[in-house]
Amino acid sequence: MSNPKRPVSPVEEFIKAFHEMSARYGRSELWYDYIDMHAIALANTCDLRCKDVREKQYHAIVQKYDENTVQQFAVLTAITMTALLENPEQDFLGTVYHNLGLSKSRAGQFFTPYNVGQMMARMSMPDSFVLDKSRIWRVNDPCCGAGCLLLAGYNAMREQLESTDPDWDKYVLFVAQDIDPLACKMCYIQMCCIGVPGVVVAGNSLFPDAERAPTDFWFTHKYFALDEKALENTYQKTGIYGI
């Protein structure tokens, strides 16, 4: 009697589709372009300030590929979004990136395994926690990578607060930053997919006063659902508005 086939995981499904594309194009270039296209598509549905600039970048990428490959990019997008919607408790893109072996070529880069991030997030949460809704709470990761720690932090807070305080995420802002623009966009995609209210900043955290371009800021959809009164109160007290 033959053993039943093991179901194909979303990570395996993504890698299979990606390998089919990489037979004609370089893997690193394909990955960069996929991440750029997915991040831009998400950003341009909620943040119109940089829409034209990002739209031009998107079309410049599309023009590099034949129609079939462009359709395959859409398949990768669907796999990613479905995987994260069905299981928010994971660093999907970080796992795929590692399994493809792409991170090995980037010196000094290490992505925290999600189970480690999950443990750290749960250990950091107090047994009971009540939000002061007169202000915005901030959760920061100055070296976010693909977003493992922030995703785990969001999930830990949701697990503890959602049943008693359904609108808790209107008062918590998750701020991610990384010197690597690719990592920033991987983090941004995943934050958008699981509904994190936040912003991702591309830049060196050691130089917070450095001038940033508008396109260095990636706002998630849920950022725009933060409570306006709490945002204003936070600005009045700290001089910090939004980020």
Can you say where each PLM-predicted feature lies in the sequence?
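Glycine- and charge-rich intrinsically disordered segments
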Residues: M1, P166, I243
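A short N-terminal interaction module
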Residues: M1-H98
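Short, charged/polar micro-motifs that form catalytic or ligand-binding hotspots
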Residues: M21-S28, R106-F111, V139, C143, ...
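Short, solvent-exposed secondary-structure capping/transition elements
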Residues: C46-K51, S105, F129-K133
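Class I SAM-dependent transferase core
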Residues: D91-R122, P126
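Conserved S-adenosyl-L-methionine
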Residues: Y114-W218
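SAM/dcSAM-binding transferase cores
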Residues: R212-I243
